[in-house]
């Protein structure tokens, strides 16, 4: 069985609106408010990551196509005011590296090997998203090609 088919890279279309902190405890409905505002502006949201801190703040990070950054920033400015959030920041110097293959869910250790390979190469992972056939990592745009080459070597994939 082939565990991995390929790596994928995406440098040109991503930007991230990151570290959006809500200063409201029990922030029920905040994600709905945020993503409704983005949807109403036709902003296509890709990877989403949410964490709740021990202090009760919510931190939501997500990626959008670079073409949607201005619209997303406008939405975020309004959301910050409406929800009394602590603010937000964007990072347009990111890319996504993914491992793709049908055997992901049945072969333990794929994620560990991916993350170890990237760590050995000095590639810092900023976000992680998984599905049954894909592991995707957001990394600095300058690290994308190096990460892809290292993953190809580690998993013995063809170019």
Language model features: what each stretch is:
Residues 1-159:
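A conserved regulatory-domain signal marking ACT and ACT-like small-molecule sensing domains
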């Amino acid at each position: 069985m082939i565990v991995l088919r390929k790596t994928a890279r995406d440098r040109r279309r991503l930007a991230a609106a990151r570290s959006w902190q809500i200063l409201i405890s029990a922030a029920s409905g905040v994600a709905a408010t945020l993503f409704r505002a983005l949807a109403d502006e036709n902003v296509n949201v890709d990877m989403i990551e949410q964490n709740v801190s021990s202090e009760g703040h919510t931190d939501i990070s997500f990626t959008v196509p670079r073409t949607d950054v201005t619209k997303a920033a406008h939405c975020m400015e309004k959301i910050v005011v409406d929800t009394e959030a602590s603010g937000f920041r964007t990072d347009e110097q990111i890319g996504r590296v993914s491992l793709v293959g049908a055997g992901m869910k049945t072969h333990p250790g794929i994620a560990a090997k991916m993350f170890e390979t990237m760590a050995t190469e000095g590639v810092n992972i900023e976000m992680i998203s998984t599905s049954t056939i894909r592991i995707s990592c957001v990394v600095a745009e300058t690290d994308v090609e190096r990460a892809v080459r290292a993953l190809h070597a580690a998993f013995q994939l063809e170019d």
